[in-house]
């Protein structure tokens, strides 16, 4: 099983939610944590929550086959039942405003992984639905 937790942007609670979900699943399953991009701070929380060293998946430095290989290698080394991946910034934000390199969507595509979208819904009702629908259709 694989799952990506992605945000509508930065500071929407991705790390808190991802770490909590990793910890919750770790009670029943062996979870291998991953982080999109070159981040080395957030993975320390993942490691504490799961007991397995978090690994980075970065489409700036890795091709799609390399992302798939690194993901599978991480699962194999930890003998994990599932891989949970925390995204970086917004789902579609990468090194270029128009390309996919370095963004969470490119890693989701490479792994054919479902995405859970995290957004800050403070003071939102119908607008939250519009944001989610917009992300779905982009």
Range-by-range predicted roles:
Residues 2-12, 16, 22-111, 115, ...:
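ATP-dependent carboxylate-amine ligase catalytic core
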